[in-house]
Amino acid sequence: MAVNFPSIDPAQLHPVAGVTLGWAEANIRKPNRKDVLVVSVEEGATVSGVFTENRFCAAPVTVCREHLAKVRAGGAGIRALVVNTGNANAGTGEPGLAHARETCAELARLAGIAPGQVLPFSTGVILEPLPIERLKAGLPAALANRAAANWHDAAQAIMTTDTLPKAASRQVTIDGHTITLTGISKGAGMIKPNMATMLGFLAFDAKVAQPVLDALAKDVADHSFNCITIDGDTSTNDSFILIASGKASLPQIASTDSPAYAALREAVTAVAQALAQLIVRDGEGATKFITVTVEGGKSAAECRQIAYAIGHSPLVKTAFYASDPNLGRILAAIGYAGVADLDVGKIDLYLDDVLVAKAGGRNPAYLEEDGQRVMKQSEIAVRVLLGRGDAQATIWTCDLSHDYVSINADYRS
């Protein structure tokens, strides 16, 4: 059950000039469901992406990296993305790579572009051959129904164990020019930073130089999709793609030092964070949405390290599910996070506005009923004060329920 998942009105997902989306039902794994997505990008756009750090990365991730490397070396720009659900094309060896390249070649043939101008993506079951003929057979239909307003359908077409489609959109003004941003994401399990079994596609109509877009993609991922965790597993397929169509009247953003870049970065990060948080709210079996903030560190990295130790802990997550204020589990996670020279005698722990631990020990004024009150909420904030610096970091996570086990035990049935 999704946690306070906002209602998404398809009419509020703004079309992005220069970007069209089409879908098909190709029976990749299950019949009568959208499972192929094609995104077409007009000539002149720039595209960038960041991908999983899992060494067992899926075949389409390898091909995406190859094609983007050619673009950065001066090759023709990306003109299309193709996504299939139901099969990850991971753990499939050389045949999987051949299938990813064959998918690009077939879409390129149908669209009149070069295979190197296509980025492929897959999500679903690992270690099973991609049903390439079914995927290829679905491409003509996906191309035929492309439209600029198909963002909600596109969000549905990339779902796996997601219970709801995930999309976000906004318009901002930069230097007097209107910029439109719309994105979709998918993911509900195998969610951990760097990134997860997560796909995210975010388009906007600003014109951005390739090196600047590359920097923006990494920066935005680090402040959004790399700040979420559901179960601590890092997937083979995770990908986050930025598309800058260049159709807006705003002059090209050619430097990361410009005020226009700062404004765009803020807007893109806001949309990406919304998409990332939707993934956590729809986490497999999730009943609670939890924000973990660690403050007073020597660096943002050590703050994030502690935040993730809390967010990954099965004991912490099951305590949240049970509404059990067994909050010593949080202190234990802080202690094993691996931060050197951590003085636990300086640490304060808050649960929402309730001071649970002060100077490394139980707050004498803390009452368990106060902790119980917070633990029963569907949204909870954990705040840790380290008392050793000015850095901070925030992550978003969820609880761990019986349903998480059931969903993953039944995943292939």
Curated annotation (Swiss-Prot):
Cellular compartments annotated: Cytoplasm
UniProt entry tagged with the keyword Hydrolase: no
Record SUPFAM superfamilies: DmpA/ArgJ-like
Disulfides per UniProt: none
Swiss-Prot/TrEMBL site (Involved in the stabilization of negative charge on the oxyanion by the formation of the oxyanion hole) positions: 123-124
GO biological process terms on file: L-arginine biosynthetic process; ornithine biosynthetic process
Catalytic residues of the enzyme: 197 (nucleophile)
Residues that coordinate or bind substrate: 160, 186, 197, 284, 408, 413
GO cellular component: cytoplasm
Residues the UniProt record annotates as site (Cleavage): 196-197
Keyword terms, alphabetized: Acyltransferase, Amino-acid biosynthesis, Arginine biosynthesis, Autocatalytic cleavage, Cytoplasm, Multifunctional enzyme, Transferase
Pathway recorded for this protein: Amino-acid biosynthesis; L-arginine biosynthesis; L-ornithine and N-acetyl-L-glutamate from L-glutamate and N(2)-acetyl-L-ornithine (cyclic): step 1/1; Amino-acid biosynthesis; L-arginine biosynthesis; N(2)-acetyl-L-ornithine from L-glutamate: step 1/4
Extent of the signal sequence: none
Predominant localisation class: cytoplasm
Catalytic activity: N(2)-acetyl-L-ornithine + L-glutamate = N-acetyl-L-glutamate + L-ornithine; L-glutamate + acetyl-CoA = N-acetyl-L-glutamate + CoA + H(+)
Subunit text: Heterotetramer of two alpha and two beta chains.
Function per UniProt: Catalyzes two activities which are involved in the cyclic version of arginine biosynthesis: the synthesis of N-acetylglutamate from glutamate and acetyl-CoA as the acetyl donor, and of ornithine by transacetylation between N(2)-acetylornithine and glutamate.
PANTHER family tied to this protein: ARGININE BIOSYNTHESIS BIFUNCTIONAL PROTEIN ARGJ, ARGININE BIOSYNTHESIS BIFUNCTIONAL PROTEIN ARGJ, MITOCHONDRIAL
Family: Belongs to the ArgJ family.
Protein name, entry field: Arginine biosynthesis bifunctional protein ArgJ
Organism: Burkholderia pseudomallei (strain K96243)
Lineage of source species: Bacteria, Pseudomonadati, Pseudomonadota, Betaproteobacteria, Burkholderiales
Gene expressing this chain: argJ
